[in-house]
Amino acid sequence: YQWMIVVMAAIMNLLDGFDVLALAFTATAIRGEFGLTGIELGYLLSAGLFGMTAGSLFLAPLADKIGRRPLLLMAVSLSAIGMLGSAFISQYQWLGFWRVITGLGVGGILVGTNVITSEYSSRKWRSFAISVYAAGFGIGAVLGGMFAVMLQGEYGWRSVFLAGAILTGLLLVVLFIWLPESIDFLTSKQPKNAEVRLNLIAKKIGLSSDWKLPAKVEKVKSKLPISQLFSEKY
């Protein structure tokens, strides 16, 4: 069960590699169809990276409120929607919009999968499991490039984005069925049915299924103005 979770995280990372570089794989065909200048193409290529940055910055804090599982399901959904929208554009400006949406999803996936992988890996195999997960992005980029060449040759550049949307959508179904919540989130935030969910997880990974939730500790919130980071104290 633990390795299944690691494999799911690696596949998410693999599809991230494909989704992020899909525009690079199809840039020549898109530039030819819409008559783009180098600057316009550069904006499109940057749109996905902008979305990734925004997703990493703004979706990461959301995981502490709603949980890693809902965050990952939402992020994978955004990625699938962005890829699907990219396949049916009629103006290149819309491609920029959908690339931002895809990037948001990819950024959210990146901040969620590393935590899930680390938590569900055994101490003995944790380093190897994280390596497998991390390798997914590069493998997705390499295999995605070869896959994109074949698709474009037969069906055109839009098929690359459509294939990415379909694969990401299938992954979403798999995650919805089998992806568990973060153990740390269940024990620290203690959402509804947290104890039941923890015991189900424990049973699946071969542990005694009689876990009890620890006393919930309320964290004292403290705010530090950003300006203080530039003071002499720091």
What is the predicted function of each stretch?
Residues Y1-Y234:
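Transmembrane-helix signature of 12-pass secondary carriers
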